[in-house]
Amino acid sequence: MTMCSGARLALLVYGIIMHSSVYSSPAAAGLRFPGIRPEEEAYGEDGNPLPDFDGSEPPGAGSPASAPRAAAAWYRPAGRRDVAHGILNEAYRKVLDQLSAGKHLQSLVARGVGGSLGGGAGDDAEPLSKRHSDGIFTDSYSRYRKQMAVKKYLAAVLGKRYKQRVKNKGRRIAYL
């Protein structure tokens, strides 16, 4: 995997956490809250419903009647979950699109497709990849050099000397 910035990594971790929390119930995740149920009623140890003393207290005030509301605040209704899931999916898709577009651009540049990114012929920057015609010349020249090295090696191995003579006109002729 390529190197990611901190923001992308944080978004990925946030997405994984939100995905797992949205699609799993506390019981499925292995979390058990004894005595707290997400319904509007609170139940005692014996299973009988407890009376609602005051419905105007904020959640977490310490009364048994506020415990179900506090628990219900952690478990959002399906409509809110869908909205949060949609927002997260949209942000996650944007990040993935940017990553895939960057990879696609890098592959195009590596292949030499798309011309110069600088926009002008006067750029002094080194090219990211060699031109096709240079590649053909380099390949044929390196093939020629390999053939000559093989001929020279075979001549030395077979006992013949590899000589070069200069004729009267100054040309060099190689003998095997």
Swiss-Prot record:
Consequence the record notes for mutating residue 151 to E: Strongly reduced affinity for ADCYAP1R1
GO cellular component, one term: perikaryon
GO biological process, alphabetically ordered: activation of adenylate cyclase activity; adenylate cyclase-activating G protein-coupled receptor signaling pathway; adenylate cyclase-modulating G protein-coupled receptor signaling pathway; cell-cell signaling; female pregnancy; insulin secretion; negative regulation of cell cycle; neuron projection development
Propeptide: 25-79, 173-176
Sites bearing Leucine amide, chain numbering: 158
Keyword Signal: yes
Any coiled-coil regions, as ranges: none
Top-rank taxon: Eukaryota
Biased composition regions of type Low complexity, renumbered to the chain: 56-68
Signal peptide stretch: 1-24
PROSITE patterns hit by this protein: GLUCAGON
Ranges for region Disordered: 39-68
Effect after changing residue 152 to E: Strongly reduced affinity for ADCYAP1R1
PANTHER family linked: GLUCAGON-FAMILY NEUROPEPTIDE, PITUITARY ADENYLATE CYCLASE-ACTIVATING POLYPEPTIDE
Role noted for this protein: PACAP is a neuropeptide involved in diverse array of physiological processes through activating the PACAP subfamily of class B1 G protein-coupled receptors: VIP receptor 1 (VIPR1), VIP receptor 2 (VIPR2), and PACAP type I receptor (ADCYAP1R1). Exerts neuroprotective and general cytoprotective effects due to anti-apoptotic, anti-inflammatory, and antioxidant actions. Promotes neuron projection development through the RAPGEF2/Rap1/B-Raf/ERK pathway. In chromaffin cells, induces long-lasting increase of intracellular calcium concentrations and neuroendocrine secretion.
Protein name in UniProt: Pituitary adenylate cyclase-activating polypeptide
Organism: Homo sapiens
GN (gene name): ADCYAP1
